[in-house]
Amino acid sequence: MATTMRLDKYLKVSRLIKRRTVAKEVAEKGRIAVNGVTAKPGTNVKSGDELVIRFGPKIVTAKIERLEENAKKEQATEMYTIIKEERTDESR
């Protein structure tokens, strides 16, 4: 098990975002924060980090539980815990 991983790869492997290219685009637009700091696609993440991801009007806050280089669909949801999901009126 890795101790750190690139943000874009983690989002893809954990299936929080289905494609790494999409994860990269979302991060480049400043729509992902790691521990309260806006993150770039290459930002290293580790277990215990908190992610806030903005998808249009939806905001998802998740805690990283563990890192895996590869994960089957059933295992992917064990890589994180959803802390909060909310909708905003904003749809940028």
Swiss-Prot record:
It holds the Pfam family S4. CDD domains: S4. One of its GO terms (biological process) is translation. One of its GO terms (molecular function) is rRNA binding. Residues 5-65 form the S4 RNA-binding domain. Keywords: Protein biosynthesis, RNA-binding, rRNA-binding, tRNA-binding. Signal peptide: none annotated. Associates with stalled 50S ribosomal subunits. Binds to RqcH, 23S rRNA and the P-site tRNA. Does not require RqcH for association with 50S subunits. Belongs to the RqcP family. Key component of the ribosome quality control system (RQC), a ribosome-associated complex that mediates the extraction of incompletely synthesized nascent chains from stalled ribosomes and their subsequent degradation. RqcH recruits Ala-charged tRNA, and with RqcP directs the elongation of stalled nascent chains on 50S ribosomal subunits, leading to non-templated C-terminal alanine extensions (Ala tail). The Ala tail promotes nascent chain degradation. RqcP is associated with the translocation-like movement of the peptidyl-tRNA from the A-site into the P-site. This is RQC P-site tRNA stabilizing factor.
